[in-house]
Amino acid sequence: FMERSLFKFALLGVMLLISHSSFSQITERERPAEWKQLVKGARFMDRFLPMKGNVLSSDTWGADCVLPRYVDNGIEDGIWSYWGGNIRKGEDGKYHLFACGWLECSPKGHMEWPNSYVFHTISDNLTGPFKPIRIIGKGHNPEIFRAKNGQYVVYVINGRYVSDDLNGKWEYGKFDFNARDRRIIEGLSNLSFAQREDSSYVMVCRGGGIWVSKDGLSEYNQLTDKRVYPDVDGRFEDPVIWRDHIQYHLIVNDWLGRIAFYLRSKDGVNWVVDPGEAYMPGVAVHADGQVEDWFKYERLKVYQDKYGRAIQANFAVIDTLKNEDKPFDHHSSKNISIPLNPGLLLTILDEKPITSGTKTIRVKIQAEEGFNPQTDIDVNSLRFGASEEVNYGRGCQVLTTENEGKDLIVTFNGKGNGITKDEFAPKLIGKYKDGRMLYGYARLPYIDYIEPILSACAPVFTKSGKGLECKVEVQNFGQVGSKKALVEVAYKKEGKTIKVASGMVPALKPYEKTDILLSAKDVVEEGKEYDLIVTLYSGKKVLSTFNLKKKVLE
């Protein structure tokens, strides 16, 4: 009896260990209560459309929850386990997916991913099937983009491949990074890139830091001193950033909670978080309602149209827990394609600033191929205004409509627009006459969308015959020249701001930098560490802040 009891106890312990090991890869995140009030079109997740494919089959690997599935969607086979990647359309008219993968029979199973290869794959269709044509080299988490000089760049963790031609020779090299006295959050991996209007690049790293390179290949400089992600509990990874004709977009995944968050920005540096899930398991749905119920969706990338709108999402997916994907088993991973609702093309016709007192707002909805705004829209369903309003079913309602060529001009009652001085992309939500969701963003005609971006490095204290001096490097990472500004170095003491030094910053050309030498006040002690705040002002407007710990004359 004693032996049987000990055996049962030991068996229970093993089962608990297995259970803990399995479920340590997931946890349930509680959603904010107000998310229950979000309307259709509020969440980024509402933009996912039915998957496309022609070959629906169960004669393939995978758990029952992903069978049958479109085996001609994305890329998959029985030899390789594929993971993340993104698509670029070539001058040959074909779609080129650069994805990573490893042999399914690898002894470590899915945990072979650190030794993955980068595959160059092609397809005649945006959704696939993609077929590998060659291996570029070693690497994980690839993302392809085109630098200012026209060269193609495939980023991988800890490196990059560069080529003059998608089908040409690829040369391996390294990026240069300048943290500019800032802490690098969670290392430099899982990078994602978005091209700015002047062909410079903004990059986000795994930890949520924002970096800028003036051409995509030269040194990346960190601008932020903290992550731009939502201020919530989350194990964040897999950020993806892109820019369209309206604004910048960023999605980041909480891999443990299996929920992603969606953010928007006017300049790619300062971000606002939109409510609702960006994606989570269950978004891979067929037109008939069948779900390819993949266990995890990671490494989101987007394919963009000529306006920069995201029209397709590509995910790395796996049918089980990663550590349960073993060699020569029935589990594996692939890269899938899911079409996205790109949103409508909107133009605000009023040039005066919109306030709470604005009586009417005129918005033009542009016709596109396959879309007639004059006949396809349920006009009475439209709501327009700040995202904070329309996402919850509020906002401006329609007064009148008029046709202009093939386009539709909608006049909204300005009441309840919710647009403040900080707004940069008002939103439209509504329905088509067949009940499908529609949405779109518009620019405000009175706002400057390309502005200087001044950023300071840590102050350097020195002694001279004139006393204590403080030198601060300031650089303009914007695409346009800056006007004169004020730099101030200070610290907090007992709730009060103690000013250490301040001085004027001259006008700077794009990417130009200068050293500002300041006379420091007798309010700091040599060798003592302070929580310093370096602030750049234009008049009373705060342009940027940099918080750091630093000793004086260390």
Place the predicted regions along the sequence by residue.
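Boundary/junction segments of secreted and surface-exposed precursor proteins
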Residues: G343-K364, E451-P459
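Short proline/glycine- and polar residue-rich coil/turn motifs
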Residues: T400-K406, V505-T514, L553
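Short, surface-exposed loop/turn segments at beta-strand-coil junctions that are enriched for proline
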Residues: K415-T420, K521-E526
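Intrinsically disordered, low-complexity Pro/Gly/Ser/Thr-rich segments with frequent PxxP/GP/PP motifs
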Residues: K496-E525
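Terminal connector regions
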Residues: D522-E554
